Amino acid sequence: CALPIYSAIGCAVFSRFELSNLTVHSLDVRVHKEKQPSSRPLMQVTAHIGQKELTLFVNHWKSKSGGEEETEIWRDWQESVLAQRVHSMYIEGFEENPIVMCGDFNRSVEDFTLQNGSKAKEGIKVVLRGTDGVLVESVSPWLKKNGSFTTEIGSYFFDGNWERIDNFFFLGDIVVNSFGSVTEPPLADEKSIPQGYNIYTDSGCSDHLPLKCEIII
């Protein structure tokens, strides 16, 4: 579990597999006139699955509270931290480890930088931008190879539209067996709209739908 100091909200990993090498990576930005808002650190942990190792990066990026455009700079910084850490793994010789990046990115998948993969027949890739020109290509289960969505239902319903701000991104030898939002009651209503928790009625769960993704490594 990782959370900012003096905060009751953080990120956590529950696992049936052995975990090791937990590290956290925090922002410390002092180049803007605006003071850096409180943010959750990036979690990095290794999962041991049989004879294989999988690196997991858990994210919860800055919300759009305060304005989407006004807060985008902080999500850009968090994107940079993630891209740099993945890039560092390749430099350190861990390029064979499959990598899963997941969490609430507060940025819908189509709003990331998208481009065709560097190899033929790879389809659309989500590109994470680091510093000094570092670019990390990843695969999103939200997207088909032609860039269209794999599901009609997103993870967050806002202003009458589905958003896909909760994400999985994959690198390495990973096959997606199944993926989608979990819409069973009491998580969602009959239209699959998430039922956020109501403190007055003590009902509902979350304004985000959980994602279920089965992968083969």
Regions found by a protein language model. Name each.
Residues 24-26, 57, 68-69, 111-115, ...:
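Short, solvent-exposed loop/turn and secondary-structure capping segments
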Residues 59, 103-104:
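Active-site flanking residues adjacent to catalytic metal/cofactor-binding acidic residues
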Residues 31-32, 66-75, 153-156, 199-200:
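Second-shell loop/turn segments in exported
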Residues 7-10, 65-68, 108-112:
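Extracytoplasmic/secreted cell-surface and envelope-processing proteins
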Residues 35-37, 88-100, 106-217:
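Metal-dependent phosphoester-hydrolase catalytic domains
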Residues 39, 49-80, 84:
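Metal-dependent phosphoester/phosphodiester hydrolase catalytic core
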Residues 2-53, 57-61:
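Structured beta-strand-rich core segments of catalytic domains in phosphoester-bond hydrolases
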Residues 9, 77, 81-84, 119, ...:
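Extracytoplasmic/secreted proteins, especially bacterial periplasmic and envelope-associated proteins
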